[in-house]
Structures are given as structure tokens and as C-alpha cells.
From Swiss-Prot:
This is UPF0478 protein SERP1299. The chain crosses the membrane at residues 7-27. It is found in: Cell membrane. Keywords: Cell membrane, Membrane, Transmembrane, Transmembrane helix. It comes from Staphylococcus epidermidis (strain ATCC 35984 / DSM 28319 / BCRC 17069 / CCUG 31568 / BM 3577 / RP62A). Belongs to the UPF0478 family.
Amino acid sequence: MDWILPIAGIIAAIAFLILCIGIVVVLISVKKNLDYVAKTLDGVEGQVQGITRETTDLLHKVNRLTEDIQGKVDRLNSVVDAVKGIGDSVQNLNGSVDRVTNSITHNISQNEDKISQVVQWSNVAMEIADKWQNRYNRRGSANYKTNTVADDANHSYNSRVNK
């Protein structure tokens, strides 16, 4: 039985050696995987930096475009305000024209008889002026004949009746 103890020691040493070899193989495999992960992370880090740069550039462009659009909107707002002011002015003008037209129509309808009388009197005044002109012209001619106002009125009446 003395021999069992050294054999057990040898078996234990061989088992320990196999265990160590197994652990070394696993550690080598893990190291390869970690190296692969490290390379992948380096690539991802480079891509993230590129994406970050592009995103920053895009944000700057968007900010510039936003400022440009805001400036144009501000300028356009002044144009819209001016057009609104013109529209308000035109609307006020239309209201004023409507009020004046209504006032004129109302005054004409109220003063229709007076206007008719004015027209009649103006016709009478024009007839008198024509008669005076005719009388003046006849006095200046060689066939001077003295007429009275009654003769002129009679002549005017006869000329209208004959027409």
C-alpha cells in the first residue's frame, strides 16, 4: 500500500496539469475574443467620432438655415403688415365712399323738388340769355328793328311751336 500514495500523487499531478492546460486554452480563447472585441470597439469608436462630426456639421447648417429662414420670415412679416394696412385703408375708403354715396342719394331724394325747380329756372335763365344775345346781335345788324321783350317771347314761343 505504500505504492498507492505515490500513484495517487502522480494522478493528482496529471489531473492538475490537465486542469491547467484546460484553463490556459480557455484563457487563450478569451484573450482572442477580447482582442476581437477591442478591435471592434476601436472601429465603433472611430465611426462614432465620424458620426459626431457629421452631426455637429449638420446642426451648424440647420442653425444657419434656421437663422436665414427667421430673417426672411421677419422681412416677410413687414410686407404682410404693409399689405394688411393697405387692405384696412381700402376698406376704410370703401366705407367712406358708401357713406358719401348714401348721403348724396338721400340729399338728392330729399331735394328732388328743389333740384327740379333749379333746373327749370336755369332753363328760363338760359332762354332769357339767348333772347338778349339775339337782341344784341340784331341791333348790330343792318336790318335794325326794335323789338320788345314781349315780341321776343312771342317769337320764341312761335319757334318752339313750329318745331
